[in-house]
C-alpha cells in the first residue's frame, strides 16, 4: 500500500511540475490563449460494493486487494473536447484510438482516423504513449487492451483510458481484466440496462488482485508461454483440416 501511495504522489508532483512549466511558457509568450489549468488532486475511487466483495477470493499473503483507480489515472475524452478540438484529417500525424481497437483478446490495429498533433496538444490527458489500458465503456463494454509501446496515439471517443501512476506490468493488468474473474469484477458495477455501460467512476472502483512487480512479470511470462503453445496447437489443427 505504501508503494502505491508514493507512486500516486510522484505522479501528481510530476503533473504540477509540468503545469508550472506550461504556465511559465504561457507568460513568456504574452499570455496568449487560456491559462493552463492547474491539475486537480488525484481522486480516490469509491470503496468496492457488495457485489465486488462477493466476487473476491483468497489471495496469497504477499498480494493485496486494490482498485483500478488506486493504480491508474482513469479518464476519457470529454464531449466538448471532441466537439471543439478534434477534426479527423487524412494527412494527420497522430492516430486516434477508439473502442474498436480494444477487442476481447487485446489490442487490434485498424485503419486509424488521424488528427494533427498540434491541434490537440492542449488535451494532455488524452495523449497516449504506450502501456496504457483501453477500457470500453459503451458498446462492447468491458473489453480491455494494452496500448503497444513505441507509438504515440490520441484517445478518441467512447473508450476509457487507464494510465498507471507508477511502474507496474500493464500486461498483467490487461490479462487480469480480460480473465473471467477480472472481467466479472469490472462489470459488476455496470449499469444494468438493455445496453450496459460503465462510468469512469465504476471503472476506478473495480478491485484488482495485485502482486509484486516481479510476480506480475512471472505471471505474464507463464500465461504468454501457455498461450503460445495453444496457438501452435491451433495452427497445427487448422493445417491438418486444410489437408484433409
Where is each model-derived feature located?
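Low-complexity, Lys/Gly-biased intrinsically disordered segments
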Residues: 24, 50, 64-105, 122-123, ...
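Extended, domain-scale alpha-helical bundle/helix-rich regions
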Residues: 1-46
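Short, well-ordered loop/turn sites that connect or cap secondary structure elements
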Residues: 127-129
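Non-catalytic DNA-recognition/assembly elements of restriction-modification systems
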Residues: 46-79, 205, 209, 213-221, ...
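Short alpha-helix capping/helix-loop boundary micro-motifs
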Residues: 114-123
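Short, ligand-facing micro-motifs at secondary-structure edges
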Residues: 81-83, 103-114, 133-156, 170-175, ...
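A short glycine-rich beta-alpha junction/loop motif
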Residues: 137-140, 152-160, 168-171, 191-213
